[in-house]
Design a protein with these regions (language model features):
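Rieske [2Fe-2S] iron-sulfur-binding domain
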Residues: 14-101
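A boundary/linker detector
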Residues: 1-3, 14
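Short amphipathic
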Residues: 4-10
């Protein structure tokens, strides 16, 4: 059974940015887009780059290692339509951000 785990507080992630967090033994990339929070696997499927450290453009993140781009609302790769990273459900509890793992 999956549980929601607190990974950050709202004020820790500015709009248009991301952050690497840990939950349930997994590294997760957490993003803020217009006050909405999204969570995907932190690992780029291309060569394992840290997505949470990438540049954010709209609802996309660019892997800092080799430039692969993902829509963090769906996990879908912009570069390869057959490729997707895992997405995690996010909910807010006051100012706490929780991710389901």
């Amino acid at each position: 059974m999956a549980d929601f785990v607190k990974v950050a507080r709202r004020g820790e992630i500015a709009d248009g940015t991301g952050k690497v967090v840990e939950a349930g033994g997994r590294k997760i990339a957490l993003f803020n887009s217009g006050g909405n929070f999204y969570a995907i696997s932190n690992t780029c499927v291309h060569q394992g780059g840290p997505l949470g450290e990438g540049d954010v453009y709209g609802t996309c993140v660019v892997c800092p290692w080799h430039g692969w781009e993902y829509d963090f609302t769906t996990g879908q790769s912009v570069d390869d339509p057959m490729t997707k990273v895992a997405c995690y459900s996010v909910k807010l509890d006051g100012d706490d951000i929780l991710v389901e793992v």
